[in-house]
């Protein structure tokens, strides 16, 4: 009785009792002596703010978390009492089982709920929604009668039992009055949970269905019953951008200061930590940098809805590219690899939401249906299924060996840009590295692991920065695009312009700036020119990636001078 009084005080304080009274009055207005004999249900949805409940009545909040079914039973008793208190003769014909309070939880602290599935208490699960079925009927009210017409022996149940109940008086098996059945809607929602191999499906009913969006992370609050799991509430998990005052890892802070905030130098050094033991330090830097930019863009897309940078590499041999992709994918929140036996690429892309979808094999190894499906999804930005539509929320990483130029250009137009794979530029360095690894194999040490951990932390810190382009940077990108388009119309397309802008903005984001300047624009252009198949716009000397920073600075300075001549625009005079 004490629990009833506490819940009653809470409902009164939050003005829920008034809402219950109004719901009861509306119910009685809609029934008469004839319809009341059909045992219609009265349902009331109670939205409980758990944080507020814990603040007002801590013991009551703890009771809700530990004993949710008893809490709901108390609410049912209170709603039935509200109905009985009304001055209406029809209330005498209403049974307690006709009354049901549907509890929906808001702001349930994840740290207070149980994470392991067990009876009684509320269990909170956090997972990625990867699929929804078509709506079907959800039976929430059934009436069972005695075939011998025993008086007053109707049984009201909120589900369809596997075995029909029996009459309390004559012990006959009851039959259901199918005309009195009440139904709502339900769907089967499939969630992918971290550290659990197989996805799990849950039944989502009525008002909760509208909250479901495929590809989003959700916190699901469930109550484990004997034969089923009841979902009480579902809330979308949103990532909050890190505050500006959040401390940066000390090593990255020192590196940024040593690089004077120059994007080409700072990002070059950051990207060099990817795949340290896969290839020599200065090999495939164009690939490493683009992988890093893609990782940042995925996280930024979740926080600021900025464009995602996809990754495509081409070359005579892309074996090292596949290894670098595998190492870089470990920095993402999640990643999914597509094999040649995947029948549905859309499922893999949805499963990779918030992370990256890696195609570890060359494009030639995949079926034409798989390639066409992925290209169509990247181009439209939508994943279409028979029962739902979802936005593409992951980056796609792919590579192809010995692709014809026209094929590479067409696919690169959809991906946005092309990275330079192995064209024999680093044959000597790779041979020496392979020999050294064979003689003295090395493993990833503590310093390498810490460096990658710092980069992952740094990506989380900068991803929430909203970036805009300065007028001069925007003009620089436009002039380069027009000049390059005039030089090679097939190699430079509209899709490349979007990738240039995204790379420029991501460069500024990595440097913790909310305005992209000319340095960011030149860096994005340098990446674009470096990744093109030969013959490239700029001389090879201007696109080298030496391990020495002084040599790299000379390369970038030469590229600045070449770019000014290529577009007829003075960069330094207007550099902000």
Show the residue positions of the predicted features:
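C-terminal engagement/docking regions of AAA+ P-loop ATPases
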Residues: 477, 486-496, 509-576
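Long, low-complexity, serine/threonine- and charged-residue-rich intrinsically disordered N-terminal tails
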Residues: 1-202, 206-216, 226-231, 278
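Long, intrinsically disordered, Lys/Arg- and Ser/Thr/Pro-rich regulatory tracts
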Residues: 1-41, 310, 322, 343, ...
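Conserved ASCE/P-loop NTPase catalytic core
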Residues: 103-104, 120-128, 133-135, 144-149, ...
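Short, surface-exposed polybasic-aromatic patches that bind anionic ligands, especially phosphate groups
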Residues: 483
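OB-fold/S1-family single-stranded nucleic acid-binding modules
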Residues: 143-145, 221-258
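Conserved phosphate/pyrophosphate-binding and hydrolysis machinery centered on Walker-type P-loop NTPases
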Residues: 116-118, 264, 280-285, 448, ...
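AAA+ P-loop ATPase catalytic core
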Residues: 288-295, 477-480, 496-511, 528
